[in-house]
């Protein structure tokens, strides 16, 4: 059996990974990707995630631009019992990050007219947690620092943006690349629920590399990241710099929290754990550089 194709990610059967001659142990280098344009002295080098990977090089008939693939084993610590979800409150405890995330320390989030992004993020994250708990779902409210190789049935990072002038309005979402095949479903379920409940317009124009390359998604750059199998998305709930968006996030936090929880539960109902963690992932090698923002 050579695997199947799901949403652009090839999925294959579990094998004895440690015995494979191309196995790279957790934390071992996978080679340099590029240099950071903001700091050329700090090369962006990929490292194998917890559980390691198998490096599959291009075959003899591959074209000159082929880069091979990385085979990521199913995590050994897949949750048992109730479904488990992580809600990350963006920028919360950013001053407590480990050394590999040291560049995130000064990034404390947006602020406008005395209202901070982190207080909005944490408040709504906690409300989402209470709602999910009431449905029998186990919830981890996470700060900036993600547990090493974090594994759950879903991960949602909550943020609020600012344009610095108070013009932009709306919400936006993204997920990373070189991850599992179920992130589009998680994103769309939350997007539909959140947009329908809040009336906010979706703002795809301002989805940035900081979102698609969000550090928590980037298992090849950071050990403190979400495991590749775990469906993970980032939600920018609105613009703290916009009077209407800010009022919505402050005065109608329960509305936002319920809509986020509704999207998550829809995803969980339609995506059993056995599908998420049923097989190894095979993803393209050499991930893109991650974002430096929390």
Language-model-detected regions and their locations in the chain:
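Catalytic cores of processing enzymes, dominated by hydrolases/peptidases
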Residues: 154, 181, 185-234
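Surface-exposed patches in mature extracellular/periplasmic domains of secreted proteins
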Residues: 135-147, 198-209, 271-280
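N-terminal secretory targeting signals
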Residues: 1-77, 278-294
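Active-site-adjacent mobile loop/cap segments within catalytic or ligand-binding domains
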Residues: 161-167, 174-175, 208-294
